Amino acid sequence: MPYCPVSPAYATVSKDYDKLRHVIDTLTPGLVFAADGARYGKAIAATVAADVEVILAQGALEGRKAGTFQSLRHTTATPAVDAAMHATGPGTIVKFLFTSGSTKMPKPVINTQRMWCANLQQITLSLPVLAEAPPVLVDWLPWNHTFGSNHNFGLTMMHGGTLYIDDGKPTAALIGETLRNLREIAPTVYFNVPTGFEMIAEAMKTDAQLRANLLSRVRLFFYSGAGLAQPVWDSLHATQEAAIGERIVMCTGLGMTESAPSAMFCNSPDVRSGHIGAPVPGMVLKLVEVDGKTEVRYRGPNVTPGYWRSDAATRDAFDDEGYLCTGDAVKWIDENNIHRGLAFDGRIAEDFKLSTGTFVSVGPMRAKIIVAGAPYIQDVV
């Protein structure tokens, strides 16, 4: 049975519920689960049809019957469960993950068993440290996003690891909870977004307990979602060298919801901010000149077959050779040594043209300004 984790912000921050209504109307679910009736009751009343079953972990809904998660746990398994499991195959849809929808309505990305299983193996082959011992994660990343869901949760499940859910996140109000958790639980691999690493790097300068616990057994730091400024990278390395006498490997790559998510990794020791590396095993890249830049396109077992009930969007997403058009621009790290891989060169769509006819490449310009203004400038918007 396919499922879809939905961003809580669609039901708690939004007042018109436009994106949540779009998700519900697109998927037409037969069952809706919510953690708390009080927190999500208004959103459910506004978007979920009366004939759709609702299950709550706690609380109740005003004027509407809802089942309880506890009651589901007491369901007696029948042979139909085994039959349904054996009927699944590589092409079976396991979940839908919606894109971020920062500029348009989010798109429902089909995630098949083939996509997820293939990508977990691709990631493991690219980062073999993950298979050396069951990983221990301390993780805040949401499961409605491919980084937290497919990548982090999937790797934990594949390798028999342990995932501690971090109720903090990299905001001024909640970073304290993350730091408290990292003082208590020592991860073996640590995943975060650049803002998270920036806050942790700053805290480690003065927090001896954080340094000691976080660096006690971690084998890999990994960031994704945006570029990590080189000054933050350098600060982390300086702290690690002073505390334990060596650097923790910092890794990143490139991917998207449509590639389950990982398409490329830089796992060389000679890596800097902006590097994205080489394709994961089984992934074929196509480099195409678009408006004076080089777009990277994907084809492989981890690439989505398309968007659910969105034929036009699916057609537009692939070129005539079946490659997924990413909109990401890349360039060679070293044109004389292609084995070093690629560097990120911004988004095709974010570039714009001045009235003089000159193209402005926003992504690389941001990185150059941060480097030029270090350590006084940490980010540019």
What label would you give each PLM region?
Residues M1-A35, I55-A57, F69-S71, P108-I110, ...:
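Short beta-strand->loop structural element characteristic of the AMP-binding/adenylate-forming
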Residues G327-A329, I333, V371-V381:
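C-terminal boundary motif of the adenylate-forming
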Residues E289-L354:
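Conserved ATP-binding/catalytic segment of the ANL
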Residues P5, M85-H86, V94-Q121:
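Conserved AMP-binding A3 loop
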Residues H159-G161, L179, T188-N192, A201-H275, ...:
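Gly/Ser/Thr-rich phosphate-binding loop
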Residues Y10-A45, G63-Q70, H74-A77, N119-V138, ...:
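Conserved ATP-dependent adenylate/AMP-binding module captured primarily in the ANL superfamily
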Residues V54-A57, L61-F98, K104-M105, V129-V136:
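Conserved pre-ATP/AMP-binding loop-to-beta segment of ANL
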Residues C117-V136, W143-L210:
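Conserved AMP-binding/adenylation subdomain of ANL enzymes
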